[in-house]
Amino acid sequence: MRHYEVMVILDPSLDERTVGPSLENMLGVVKTEGGKIDKVDIWGRRRLAYEIRKQAEGIYAVIDLTASPATVNELDRQLGLNESVLRTKVLRHDK
């Protein structure tokens, strides 16, 4: 198991109150594969440096988790398939 930080930029048309529950649904693969979600930090709506899919803003969320590399690959794949996700970035923490 390794420590990861996942940054997700969501579509700004989503209601900010529903971002938390929808992230929990997206992160279900981590729990089913035996990983652990350490922290979910929702930064809220921010202006993007450049447009992504014709959007100038996005809702940022940062997730700290502990999981196997295969689980994180599957999470990144599923987030990429989700239409409400504009962009993801996965970083591995060395502790």
Swiss-Prot record:
Keywords: Ribonucleoprotein, Ribosomal protein, RNA-binding, rRNA-binding. Gene3D superfamilies: 3.30.70.60. InterPro entries: Ribosomal_bS6, Ribosomal_bS6_CS, Ribosomal_bS6_sf, Ribosomal_S6_plastid/chlpt, Transl_elong_EF1B/ribsomal_bS6. One of its GO terms (molecular function) is structural constituent of ribosome. GO terms for biological process: translation. The keyword Lyase does not apply. One of its GO terms (cellular component) is ribonucleoprotein complex. It comes from the Bacteria. Signal peptide: none annotated. The keyword ATP-binding does not apply. Belongs to the bacterial ribosomal protein bS6 family. Binds together with bS18 to 16S ribosomal RNA. This is Small ribosomal subunit protein bS6. The lineage of its organism: Bacteria, Bacillati, Actinomycetota, Actinomycetes, Mycobacteriales.
